[in-house]
């Protein structure tokens, strides 16, 4: 910590020489990321005029709130938040895995504790995270406008704004559920041992939830006017069906492994199902890349997602 203290002191001396003024008059922030927060928590002192930019845990949960001592800081406090994660142990880049209630909860915790001078959001490639970006921008504009029991209202308004009134209720439900299911287990972190294939029909129940959701998304999509088709595919249909496919790949692979160990010929049925789902994923991604909006968003959904990092 002594070395780090010398580094900050040296930086402030350089700022003072270059700008010809007291460093306390020059806006500065100190990013309290994962590898740095342990020093701060052990008592490392940061000049009072420097903003403290606290970071979440890389998976959308803030690490701390601002106690009263920090709320009085001249430099204030900010938050660095991830809706996209590129790094170990796993990425979270391919598709939205964050629910609106979770976002509202986490940003409200920050806001109510004085972490409100600056919010920086890691949004990755933008396209996969359009929904959480929209919510965060609206919430940042007026945190008091969206209460804890109004997140469903926000989703309906979002759906109505993008697709009209007729199907807003159905679409908001689809979006809420796929992001909730993805939050159970993010696609890039799926594995064959997450949901049990032997206890309480857990794997079967999860498979049924995803299949039902995908069927509903198809049904609503057939009712979409032509003008909304592309938007519906990229904001609703692809996230729902592609997420459902990845989830079922691992659920089917889990049964394949179990049944193979048991010497059951039905293990082959689940092996074929995995192959079918890979084909569906390839076809959907190709459509997104080459057909949707004339290929405007090519490669946006080509991130690795159906092969486990483990």
Describe the residue ranges of each PLM region:
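Gly/Pro-rich turn-and-neighbor structural signature
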Residues: 1-74, 203-232
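Short secondary-structure boundary/capping segments
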Residues: 1-3, 44-49, 67-70, 94-101, ...
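Flexible loop/turn segments at secondary-structure boundaries
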Residues: 35-40, 59-62, 69, 85-90, ...
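Conserved, mostly hydrophobic/aromatic
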Residues: 52, 110, 122, 158, ...
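Active-site clefts of carbohydrate-active enzymes
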Residues: 74-98
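Catalytic-core region of carbohydrate-active enzymes that cleave or remodel glycosidic bonds
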Residues: 94-121, 135-143, 269-286
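C-terminal non-catalytic alpha-helical accessory regions
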Residues: 153-308
